[in-house]
Amino acid sequence: MKTHIIKNLIFVGLLGFLLSSCQDKYFEDSGIHDAVYDGTVMDYIKNRPDVFDSLNTIIQLSGLESVLDQEGVTFFAPGDPSIRKALYELNENLFAIGRDTVLTLDQVDPSVWREYLSMYIYNDTYVLKDIPQLDTLNMNIFPGQGFISYGGQNMNIGVNYNDVISENSSGQKQVVKYAGYRQLFLSYILDISNVGSFGSIINAPVASSDIRTTNGVIHALEYRRHTFGFSSANFINSAYSKGIIYK
């Protein structure tokens, strides 16, 4: 029991350090990229271990590398901190029920990684200008667009048009609706029968969009506002039901 507690404390401490040491290099609102990367989507991921080291590992574990090398693919890339957050919440759950925690990514069943990673992959190439407007507070008017992910999951993709807010000479706030910067969103639909109602979708904003490669495009998700898998409860249930691989 003492060994079990020490292992968990070491893991939680290490994970906390990793999360706190994340730098701005993790694609924090860096805008739209026009240059074409000389390589495939998978090549780009492999060549950015500073951002996508854990992501590269779970791609290998899930067997999806060939999919990201195929012609015509769009990948909403979750940064490593998003993956660490999902593992942290899984380990909190395991610790609460007296189970040993996950120390390495390969302790989660590969089918779980494949199921949830497939939510971020789309056949064909979609850049920001291809996607309709999304207003998460007014989806009846600006709903974005429904998409089916590579894994068959109902998802929504849209572009949020931010407002321009300023003050006039009298100090009164002035708002110009939808005149600000545009930001791409990938959203998980919780309730397909009631899209647009409060709490019906979970949004993942994109920090850096339109990273073009020789076979497709990457949109890097904003790690501070996203946890891998969108729903921590779903990810935890899947990982637990498939069985943690203890070594």
Report the location of each language-model feature:
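Bacterial N-terminal signal peptides that target proteins for export
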Residues: 1-10
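Hydrophobic alpha-helical membrane-embedded or membrane-associated segments
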Residues: 12-15
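Mature, structured domains of secreted/extracytosolic soluble proteins
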Residues: 22-247
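C-terminal motif of bacterial Sec signal peptides marking the signal peptidase cleavage site
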Residues: 17-21
